[in-house]
Amino acid sequence: MGRLASRPLLLALLSLALCRGRVVRVPTATLVRVVGTELVIPCNVSDYDGPSEQNFDWSFSSLGSSFVELASTWEVGFPAQLYQERLQRGEILLRRTANDAVELHIKNVQPSDQGHYKCSTPSTDATVQGNYEDTVQVKVLADSLHVGPSARPPPSLSLREGEPFELRCTAASASPLHTHLALLWEVHRGPARRSVLALTHEGRFHPGLGYEQRYHSGDVRLDTVGSDAYRLSVSRALSADQGSYRCIVSEWIAEQGNWQEIQEKAVEVATVVIQPSVLRAAVPKNVSVAEGKELDLTCNITTDRADDVRPEVTWSFSRMPDSTLPGSRVLARLDRDSLVHSSPHVALSHVDARSYHLLVRDVSKENSGYYYCHVSLWAPGHNRSWHKVAEAVSSPAGVGVTWLEPDYQVYLNASKVPGFADDPTELACRVVDTKSGEANVRFTVSWYYRMNRRSDNVVTSELLAVMDGDWTLKYGERSKQRAQDGDFIFSKEHTDTFNFRIQRTTEEDRGNYYCVVSAWTKQRNNSWVKSKDVFSKPVNIFWALEDSVLVVKARQPKPFFAAGNTFEMTCKVSSKNIKSPRYSVLIMAEKPVGDLSSPNETKYIISLDQDSVVKLENWTDASRVDGVVLEKVQEDEFRYRMYQTQVSDAGLYRCMVTAWSPVRGSLWREAATSLSNPIEIDFQTSGPIFNASVHSDTPSVIRGDLIKLFCIITVEGAALDPDDMAFDVSWFAVHSFGLDKAPVLLSSLDRKGIVTTSRRDWKSDLSLERVSVLEFLLQVHGSEDQDFGNYYCSVTPWVKSPTGSWQKEAEIHSKPVFITVKMDVLNAFKYPLLIGVGLSTVIGLLSCLIGYCSSHWCCKKEVQETRRERRRLMSMEMD
């Protein structure tokens, strides 16, 4: 049943698909045009196959029966001979608007062009379907539209602003068809044109841009007079109404449900000239008034308007002789309703019809400037509206206020002058010989700095600080940070004295300083206005710059001594060009030049700062903590002593002295540093010579094995009893193939037999022991990969002197021995292999077990037996 119901739907869709084909369209309704206008007929094609760009052929028939070729988009010889000349002149042309659309344009249509126009398209389809042409009828009407002005030639109207005027034009049509007329009034002023008011073909009014408000107020109107006259009425003319007025009439006809314009005509109606109103405003040019008196200015108006215009007068003030510049302000205003708007100190009065007075009471210096009188004439408009008909601004009236200027002098002197850097500087700026009242005048100061220059170049001044009329101090860029740090201090100790102090004068502060004292006069509104500036003479802050000189001489009172005696050295200091110096001393020792183990080593022993505080620097001999003394003998002399000298103390000793100069508070500034001549300690001995070497029977081991390293000491020269010598032994390692890394201390054994072992980050252990008198054994137990590298020992011998004291010899170092730690490949891979084999076996057995269980229980199929009939054989024997 369902299949039968769907058959009609399928048949309908099939028939629709079969009927679908090319569609050519032109306007369906008859096109009506007027002789002399342009005819445009569009044509388009849709639902076609083939290329996207289609070609079009146009044909014409006056009666609709036989068509003559008119134009083609693809065949040059298609048009008939009758239309070849019009095509060449461009009166007939085809304009493609899209790949599937084209327009036929016929300019200057004539009655002979009335008829039927056919648009056809050549076939590009696989099968011929649809329509390939379409026809539209065109009617050509005679020109029956008549448009003209009310008077010929067009008149020229000369008006003044505010006066009314009217313009008329006639328009009528004798068309046999039902048409509507539309009318537009347009004004031309130079190249620009503006629409004033329009009456559409639907009978609606549309004011032009800028005329909306005047149209709604009734100032601009459009109405008809009789059957064919249209009147434009303007109740009050404006300057913008000047220009040439045109009347543009268009004829419209209903076409395909819409209105189509079929022709348009324009005519010049009149030229309107708006004569500007004469308006001038005059004020006195220069006026002088004493401070505290009244300022009276008169503005006289001259105009040619005698109608009911109303003036609006505004008085404004500016510091500049140009009222258009920013900064001018309005003092008083009299509007067109004779209402005055002003401040309490300003009055505006109307003396007569052409004179207006401005009165400013209690004038002061701030009233000096330029005064302007601004006059506007307003004429009444429609519906109680007003519009401006004239405007004028007077020339400026210069007003000068004479007042008693404060009279005073300014002197600047330096109460403190620096002699060195970091000394304070103090300047005092005094105001003297004042001759004005204290109640109405106050003084402020500005401080300036100018750099010294040897050349004649002009140097600009830099602002240090400026004080406003309310005594608010503002810092300049040069002094802002130092003033915040308290280094620059600006103060006012008395009413007539301003002070500037530099707590710590630097070399950059040298130069010329001057002050500017400003007088401020109190105004009637209790504000203060600057009235005068007086400059002081500059004061030069300068001191000669000389290099600081510091000389240190060291001497040795007892030049000859033996080991175990006391070494004494004194350092004498002399300085120049350093202010109130204090000295800090550092005693330093250098290895002798002949000591090849460390030729550039410098050791700081003891120091004494500028406050006489003693500090041990790198003196690490625990047995001689009190063995060195540094003391201050005089302000410029220091003495260094070293008790119980040893052979290891040999070297060059110097005094490094630093001179310190005091700055603000308890701070000190480093002024200079100098090094003394060296004093040498040299022991001429014929004692033994010690050497150290490292030996290992196992330079290459497997990880986990024991590493043995022997530090062997040999003695050359005089034989010593084993009890007369002892050793401090330290083991170091550089864990790299080269010696590019810093050595790491492993373990040490001092001469008293105390062993110290450094902390390690891996599992191997260290042990250090003395095997014999001259042999020391370092053992690494359970060696790791990190234990590879260069190993060496450092030995410090101690020898007992004949007096029974122990003398420390120079430290010696052995040459390094490289130790390699290898990995045991069999042991490394034994357990991983066993674990892998075991896991593989377990996984294989488990896989077999899973397969067996799956095949036995999950995949077993039930087999049905075929029933067979079993019949016994019958015996063939016959009874």
Curated annotation (Swiss-Prot):
Modified residue annotations for Phosphothreonine: 271
Subcellular location: Endoplasmic reticulum membrane; Golgi apparatus, trans-Golgi network membrane
Annotated motif Cell attachment site, positions: 703-705
Keywords: Disulfide bond, Endoplasmic reticulum, Glycoprotein, Golgi apparatus, Immunoglobulin domain, Membrane, Phosphoprotein, Repeat, Signal, Transmembrane, Transmembrane helix
Disulfide links within the chain: 43-119, 169-247, 299-373, 429-515, 571-655, 711-793
Record's bilayer topology term: Single-pass type I membrane protein
Motif residue range(s): Endoplasmic reticulum retention signal: 424-427
Annotated transmembrane regions: 833-853
InterPro entries: Ig-like_dom (IPR007110), Ig-like_dom_sf (IPR036179), Ig-like_fold (IPR013783), Ig_sub (IPR003599), Ig_V-set (IPR013106), IgSF_V-set/TM_domain (IPR051102)
GO CC term (a single one): Golgi apparatus
GO BP: any one term: lipid droplet organization
Biological function: Inhibits the binding of prostaglandin F2-alpha (PGF2-alpha) to its specific FP receptor, by decreasing the receptor number rather than the affinity constant. Functional coupling with the prostaglandin F2-alpha receptor seems to occur. In myoblasts, associates with tetraspanins CD9 and CD81 to prevent myotube fusion during muscle regeneration.
Protein name: Prostaglandin F2 receptor negative regulator
